[in-house]
Regions:
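Glycine-rich phosphate/diphosphate-binding loop of Rossmann-like nucleotide-binding domains
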Residues: 1-20
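C-terminal binding/interaction regions
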Residues: 2-8, 84-147
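Short amphipathic alpha-helical segments
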Residues: 12-15, 68-72, 112-113
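Short, structured coil segments at secondary-structure junctions
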Residues: 20, 73-74, 94
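A short beta-strand-loop structural module common to alpha/beta enzyme folds
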Residues: 23-35
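Helix-loop module immediately N-terminal to the HCX5R catalytic loop
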Residues: 34-45
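Helix-adjacent hinge/juxtasegments
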Residues: 43-80
């Protein structure tokens, strides 16, 4: 779980995850150190990509910056989710593995509902497997070109 700035919503989400029994790796401001949003997102995304953690949550003012930055890490499918249904869909239809939340428009209780939906949705819709694989091929194609 990472954020660029200390914010009650980000802290509430980390605390909520711990209350649910999850081990939370606190990155960036969630860990007590204000961190530029690209670095906070990278720290969380690398942990997910390395499979050191099961999933990640990243936050910044709009959620857009951290989602863009996290998606630069190979193997990451970060989704900016504004409600529980978006979170469910991101997991079910896109196999998203990093949740991005905007702090400017998401209060603590709403963020907790989004996180709950994210965690409760574990199974990817099998009819989307081919599309998810297409995204993986796109990533491989463009990652190879940039080396």
């Amino acid at each position: 779980m990472g954020s660029d700035t200390r914010h009650e919503t980000a802290t509430a989400v980390a605390d909520h995850l711990e209350r649910l029994g999850h081990t939370v790796v606190r990155c960036g401001a969630v860990g007590g150190v204000d961190t530029p949003w690209p670095e906070a997102a990278d720290e969380v995304a690398r942990l997910v990509a390395q499979r050191a953690v099961d999933t990640g949550v990243v936050c910044c003012w709009t959620g857009t910056g951290v989602s863009i930055a996290a998606n630069k890490v190979p193997g990451i499918r970060a989704a900016l989710c504004i409600d529980a249904e978006t979170a469910r869909g991101a997991r079910r239809w896109n196999d998203a593995n990093v949740l991005a939340i905007g702090l400017s428009n998401t209060d603590a209780r709403s963020a907790e509902r989004i996180v709950d939906a994210w965690l409760e949705t574990r199974d990817v819709d099998p009819t989307e497997a081919e599309n998810i694989e297409r995204v993986a091929r796109l990533e491989q194609r463009y990652t190879r070109r940039q080396r």
